């Protein structure tokens, strides 16, 4: 009351109304608002506000790598590129050769000696050590025989997690049996925990995908059969999922997150040239064929036998954007049964949308053990962006 008498022009706005105002502001103004007061920051970083803001987005963009080996930290480049089909591409300045994963607009990049988690929208970058185990130098650190990584979100708690399955062969540790490590990093706390291994051996796996609170890997337990290895990020339990019967090869068989559902994309290249997409019902883990796209006479087929396609996103009208392993981007219109060529030399990372979820205030980087090098401590990196400009024309009581 005394404060209101001293400043009669001030206005007190209840939290619900203030949140509604923030929802209508552009991104730059929201980032500025975080520095105004603790109360505003608390509202803008709340789980409710972050989820409401994401749900209001009308259209997702496409995130592509602007490949650069300069060694600077990854960051989102200003502006965007508009291509055919009314698709918008934003570029992440990074080394495209490094393995990366995305979840809800956050990006996880595996560097040879640490893990970066980046929120491109808030310009926050957090760096973590690899936790348990040994890093075997730059040349072998990302060999599929050694590492199976994943990044996703616990749909119950909302926390983001990095998962590591480390498969070390006999020749590298001189042991009788291979040493297998299963561990999970909580991005919020920066702590690694060991997971219970599955009741079966995990051999060859492919790059992971996250969807609906789980991380999935294509797993080949035998020479002929493929299955999907699933990790529930809340229960932190592993189990197998069967795949639909189809003719597959290691190259053409892909798993993707398509509108927060796990999907399989399989490119047929022999008797017929087509792209089939199957989507999984998460509750009962059954599959439904959602697309069968005829590629014959629609896409240049000079490299047909060594070419496969990966879907990126599906619009509300059912139009699907996909790309091939030669960095060419396409869009399929089911109603017209047409394929539109969008762009070339586009290194697609994932669909992309705004996420204002805050990352922890500090990075946690433990000293990794590197073969042939002393255990020198590594520095902790925290990058937080800020923009300054006027926001409101009236005084607000905080």
Swiss-Prot record:
It comes from the Eukaryota. SMART domains: FBOX. Residues 8-55 form the F-box domain. Disulfide bonds: none annotated. Pfam families: F-box, FBA_3. Transmembrane segments: none annotated. This is Putative F-box protein At4g17780.
């Amino acid at each position: 009351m005394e404060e209101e008498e001293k400043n009669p022009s001030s206005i007190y706005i209840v939290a619900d109304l203030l949140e509604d105002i923030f929802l209508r502001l552009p991104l730059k103004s929201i980032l500025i608002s975080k520095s105004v007061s603790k109360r505003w920051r608390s509202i803008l970083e709340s789980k409710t506000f972050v989820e409401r803001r994401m749900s209001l987005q009308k259209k997702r963009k496409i995130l592509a790598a602007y490949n650069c080996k300069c060694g600077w930290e990854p960051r989102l480049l200003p502006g965007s590129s508009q291509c055919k089909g009314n698709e918008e591409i934003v570029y992440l300045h990074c080394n495209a050769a490094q393995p990366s994963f995305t979840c809800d607009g956050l990006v996880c990049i595996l560097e040879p000696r640490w893990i970066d988690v980046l929120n491109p929208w808030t310009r926050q970058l957090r760096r973590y050590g690899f936790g348990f185990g040994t890093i075997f130098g730059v040349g072998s650190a990302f060999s599929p025989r050694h590492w199976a990584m994943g990044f996703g979100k616990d749909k119950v708690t909302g926390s983001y997690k990095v998962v590591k399955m480390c498969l070390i062969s006999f020749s590298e540790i001189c042991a009788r049996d291979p040493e297998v490590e299963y561990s999970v990093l909580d991005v919020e706390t920066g702590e690694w925990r060991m997971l219970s291994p599955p009741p079966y051996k995990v051999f060859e796996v492919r790059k992971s995908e996250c969807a609906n609170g789980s991380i999935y890997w294509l797993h080949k337990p035998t020479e002929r059969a493929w299955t999907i290895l699933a990790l529930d990020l809340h229960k932190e339990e592993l189990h197998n999922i069967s795949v639909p019967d189809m003719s597959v090869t290691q190259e053409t068989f892909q798993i993707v997150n398509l509108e927060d559902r796990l999907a399989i994309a399989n490119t047929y290249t022999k008797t017929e040239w087509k792209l089939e997409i199957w989507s999984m019902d998460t509750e009962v883990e059954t599959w439904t064929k959602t697309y069968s796209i005829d590629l014959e006479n629609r896409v240049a087929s000079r490299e047909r036998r060594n070419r496969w396609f990966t879907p990126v996103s599906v619009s509300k009208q059912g139009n699907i954007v996909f790309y091939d392993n030669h960095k060419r981007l396409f869009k399929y219109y089911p109603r017209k049964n047409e394929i539109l060529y969008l762009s070339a030399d586009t290194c697609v990372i994932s669909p992309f949308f705004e996420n204002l979820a805050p990352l922890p205030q500090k990075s946690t980087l433990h000293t990794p053990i590197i073969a042939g090098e002393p255990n020198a401590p590594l520095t902790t990196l925290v990058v937080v962006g800020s923009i300054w400009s006027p926001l409101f024309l009236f005084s607000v009581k905080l």
